[in-house]
Amino acid sequence: MEKKKVVLAYSGGLDTSVAIKWLQEKNYDIIALCLDLGEGKDLAFVKEKALSVGAIKSYMIDVQEEFANEYALMAMQAHTLYEGKYPLVSALSRPLIAKKLVEIAEQEGATAVAHGCTGKGNDQVRFEVSIQALNPYLEVIAPVREWKWSREEEIAYAKENNVPIPINLDSPFSIDQNLWGRSNECGILEDPWAAPPEDAYEMTLALEDTPNKPEFVEIGFEAGVPTTLNGTAYPLSELIKTLNALAGKHGVGRIDHVENRLVGIKSREVYECPAAMTLITAHKELEDLTLVKEVAHFKPMIEQKITELIYNGLWFSPLKQALHAFLQETQKNVTGTVRVKLFKGHAIVEGRKSEYSLYDEKLATYTAQDEFNHDAAVGFISLFGLPTKVYSQVNQKKVEA
């Protein structure tokens, strides 16, 4: 019987390594796909590990710049903070992973793709909805969801099949990381009352260990895209990495969040997003300077919907594409520089400037240079308040009657 091909999203961890053996038993030839999203793994080792476990082919693709420009950038411009706190670290990477799975499957003539998600997380939804949107004819296999093993049973299976056991397997935490940040759950973090231990963090320093002097960074934007730090130009992926180090040193971007998952449960997670939180803060301030009032007040409603769509795995939905078009239109004049003070866990904007600034000091000042027409206020107030005045007059007459 001829074997079918499956492309597996491979991380190098226990679950996806065991999945290779499990899929082999189901008569599949496995093609492993590992993406470099800026998480800092030894990806050459991961690529070779897939082959040693049993994959017939192993891909390692650097997608850092694509992730930065096509995914993280939109999240920053839309100020995506799920439930007001979480900058969608993991949710942003899933549609890109799904896209690459489909591309390699089509290139290799595979009939299926596979992922290592469990049956109680959001990621299974994000992967499978994205894959269906890109190629509805591919079979999607979720080995971890299907085999329903305990951790002990999985380890026993790995030992029986000579699958290497990761040396960090005794770590209580489940970690996901990319350019945009780091998420951490499980272990002691499952108790929402327990304080996160310091070893739960990696990208940021504890406030007690941060410098006692602030550091200032000037972030330059061109049409809504961060392009420079302190006058030095960077590709977006490198700018994010550099800012992660700068802001992380000052403890910026630590988030402890109990969130409402798509699958109906609450989960407690700890996030580290130093660059993401700094960029979102700076970008919002530059928009305040350059967007007209109507757009500035309407845009948060669009941002909320974009955030929900991304969190819920609907990156490739028609609505998300339509809202992205609106978002891009708003960014044409978001050009300028924002000065941010990094200090003791805070990213504080202390200055902003733009050639497209709608702030006119001669209109805003209370000095002798004031050019605002104060006399125009009388007529404006009369017309602006007219509906309220008429309503009051009508209802007072009824009371008197």
Curated annotation (Swiss-Prot):
L-citrulline binds at residues 86, 122, 126, 174, 183, 259, 271. It comes from the Bacteria. It is an enzyme of class 6 (ligase). The keyword Plastid does not apply. Pathway: Amino-acid biosynthesis; L-arginine biosynthesis; L-arginine from L-ornithine and carbamoyl phosphate: step 2/3. It is found in: Cytoplasm. GO terms for cellular component: cytoplasm. Its main location: cytoplasm. InterPro entries: Arginosuc_syn_C (IPR048268), Arginosuc_syn_N (IPR048267), Arginosuc_synth (IPR001518), Arginosuc_synth_CS (IPR018223), Arginosuc_synth_type_1_subfam (IPR023434), AS_cat/multimer_dom_body (IPR024074), Rossmann-like_a/b/a_fold (IPR014729). Its EC number is 6.3.4.5. It catalyses: L-citrulline + L-aspartate + ATP = 2-(N(omega)-L-arginino)succinate + AMP + diphosphate + H(+). ATP binds at residues 9-17, 116. One of its GO terms (biological process) is urea cycle. Pfam families: Arginosuc_syn_C, Arginosuc_synth. Keywords: Amino-acid biosynthesis, Arginine biosynthesis, ATP-binding, Cytoplasm, Ligase, Nucleotide-binding. GO terms for molecular function: argininosuccinate synthase activity; ATP binding. PROSITE patterns: ARGININOSUCCIN_SYN_1, ARGININOSUCCIN_SYN_2. L-aspartate binds at residues 118, 122-123. Homotetramer. Belongs to the argininosuccinate synthase family. Type 1 subfamily. This is Argininosuccinate synthase. It comes from Bacillus anthracis. The gene is argG.
